[in-house]
């Protein structure tokens, strides 16, 4: 799972943090820690459990070197998944009659320190790189030069459901907007995570005519991640999918984020303003912080260079055609990400095998395909999607959502399989997004069939719903869900142990006490959900008034 998605549960990071591309090295593991070593007792596994384990043994082996998107090892893993889809009797649904959909990627990073200056009363004050500001790479242009007056817009959030419009009373057309990082802690988890992201804030700004943004660090930001650490990471590459001209796709529609200003940089920006930076910084510590937007007596000039490195990877896509002539044109998507974070670190063991994240999700996807084929095609078609570059920012799923290999209007639901922690016998399950649409009753029936309870989100403040591949379908208006084993009984301790000890580390391998029979239960629940959706008399719709269903104009219950 993408680092931002879960690391927040156990270590505090800024909401706008982005997973970085891991450097590739040539080191391999010593034989004593090979992930192929058995981790559980010698008791024979059921055929279903053995099948799941066999997939994970291959995908999480040292030979796959962490399955980093763009690597040759990832390509081998993709061919393996394609062969398994073929063996399950699925039809190819990728490019050119094959199982693969090529995903053009581009890695980008700032080229040099850039330049930022503040002009006030005819005098220009240059800001200091690493002390006052860190520039932001622009995936759409090699050279970004902007100069415009600055308007402060609080958090930069527009959320009528919270009585908040941080743009009320100010005109930002042709201006650069400055907003404090994050979002008010009083907001609820899933919506807070979405509203607090830099991409969402840039979208609000662009819709109102702004031409650029800058993010302001607050004392809370500094406590979560010191600005010096942000500056240290500025040389790391980020990634997105590439446009035909080689530039990168951006969600926010092209408006550039210019820089992040430190506490000292923000203080310099607010010299001469009606409201002092000290007052704003103090207000930002409140759970429901409120700011008065204002035009600052300052023009900000920015010059930032961005370097680009092209790469390629692929999604793996297969189809089981539906059996009902009237409903077969509608498609239920089952998805899981195939990539992991590759090879990095200074220890002897540098290979991040990604057994639970997310080789076991891919194994579950393959086994669900085999079960569909065994039990017969449902009324609707089912598309099986193994995506690349989830760890880089949900990129493969975003590419598919924008370049679907089936008509976009035909996709009616998504069920996503991402990092089920299966090191214990689970007593409950959590369905992220399950209460937002008419998928809810379907999910409840499937979970009950496993003899476990359906529990509410145990960590709502982390906004997990917006942080995995299914959210790319949500952004297209498609009702979506993904499930985790819950935290009842031994679950809480097992999840906390995995997150603190093995998550995004080389120890996420087959030396863990993975309960393979629990994988069979996990597959069964998700299969029942997908089968029920595909055989239902009507397509799922968003519950009336749901925030994300309304925001992304999805089908809504009356």
Cite the ranges covered by each PLM segment.
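Noncatalytic luminal/extracellular "stalk/propeptide" segments of secretory-pathway proteins
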Residues: 54, 65-184, 295-296, 308, ...
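Soluble metallo-hydrolase cores and metallopeptidase-like ectodomains found primarily
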Residues: 119-121, 129-169, 250-354, 367-370, ...
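N-terminal hydrophobic or amphipathic helices/low-complexity stretches enriched
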Residues: 20-94, 265, 329, 558
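Sec-dependent N-terminal signal peptides
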Residues: 1-20
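Metal-dependent peptidase/peptidase-like ectodomains
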Residues: 142-143, 168, 242-279, 377, ...
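Second-shell loop/turn segments in exported
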Residues: 38-46, 62-72, 87, 102-104, ...
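Extracellular/luminal Protease-associated
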Residues: 127-249, 321, 329, 350-353, ...
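His/Asp/Glu-rich mid-to-C-terminal helical/loop segments that flank catalytic regions of hydrolases
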Residues: 370, 374, 484, 490-553, ...
């Amino acid at each position: 799972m993408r680092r931002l998605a879960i690391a927040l549960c156990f270590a505090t990071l800024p909401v706008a943090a982005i997973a970085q591309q891991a450097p590739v090295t040539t080191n391999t593991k010593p034989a004593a820690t090979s992930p192929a070593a058995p981790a559980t007792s010698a008791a024979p596994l059921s055929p279903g459990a053995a099948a799941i384990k066999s997939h994970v043994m291959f995908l999480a082996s040292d030979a796959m070197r962490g399955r980093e998107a763009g690597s040759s090892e990832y390509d081998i893993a993709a061919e393996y998944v394609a062969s398994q889809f073929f063996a399950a009797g699925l039809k190819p649904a990728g490019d050119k009659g094959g199982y693969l959909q090529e995903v053009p990627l581009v890695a980008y990073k700032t080229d040099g320190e850039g330049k930022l200056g503040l002009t006030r009363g005819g005098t220009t004050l240059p800001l200091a790189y690493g002390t006052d500001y860190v520039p932001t790479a622009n995936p759409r242009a090699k050279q970004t030069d902007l100069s415009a007056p600055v308007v402060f817009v609080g958090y930069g959030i527009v959320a009528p459901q919270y009585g908040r419009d941080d743009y009320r009373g100010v005109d930002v057309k042709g201006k650069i907007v400055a907003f404090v990082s994050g979002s008010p802690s009083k907001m609820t988890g899933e919506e807070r995570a979405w509203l607090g992201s830099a991409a969402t804030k840039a979208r609000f700004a662009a819709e109102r005519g702004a031409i650029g943004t800058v993010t302001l660090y607050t004392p809370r930001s500094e406590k979560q991640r010191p600005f010096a650490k942000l500056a240290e990471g500025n040389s790391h590459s980020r990634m997105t999918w590439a446009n035909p001209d080689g530039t990168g796709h951006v969600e926010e529609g092209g408006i550039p984020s210019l820089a992040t200003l430190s506490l000292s940089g923000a203080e310099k920006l607010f010299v001469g303003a009606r409201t002092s930076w000290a007052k704003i910084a103090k207000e930002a510590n409140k759970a429901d912080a409120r700011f008065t937007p204002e035009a600052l007596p300052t023009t900000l000039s920015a010059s930032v260079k961005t370097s680009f490195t092209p790469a390629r990877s692929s999604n793996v896509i297969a189809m089981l055609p539906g059996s009902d002539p009237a409903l077969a044109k509608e498609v239920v998507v089952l998805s899981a990400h195939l990539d992991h974070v590759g090879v990095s670190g200074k220890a002897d063991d540098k290979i991040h095998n990604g057994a639970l994240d997310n080789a076991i999700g891919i194994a579950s996807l393959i086994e669900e395909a085999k079960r569909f084929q065994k039990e017969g095609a449902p009324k609707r078609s089912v598309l099986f999607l193994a995506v690349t570059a989830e760890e880089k920012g949900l990129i493969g799923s975003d590419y598919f959502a924008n370049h679907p290999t089936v008509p976009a209007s035909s996709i009616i639901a998504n069920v996503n399989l991402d990092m089920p922690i299966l090191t214990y016998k689970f007593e409950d399950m959590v369905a992220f997004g399950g209460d937002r649409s008419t998928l809810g009753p379907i999910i409840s029936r499937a979970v009950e069939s496993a003899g476990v309870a359906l529990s509410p989100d145990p960590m709502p403040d982390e906004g997990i719903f917006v942080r995995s591949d299914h959210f790319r379908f949500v952004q297209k208006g498609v009702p979506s869900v993904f499930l985790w084993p819950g935290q009842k009984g031994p679950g809480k301790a097992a999840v906390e142990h995995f997150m603190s000890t093995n998550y995004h580390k080389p120890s996420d391998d087959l030396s863990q006490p993975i309960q393979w029979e629990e994988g069979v239960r996990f597959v069964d629940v998700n299969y029942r959900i997908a089968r029920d959706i595909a055989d239902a008399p009507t397509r799922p719709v968003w519950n009336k008034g749901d925030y994300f269903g309304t925001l992304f104009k999805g089908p809504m219950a009356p």
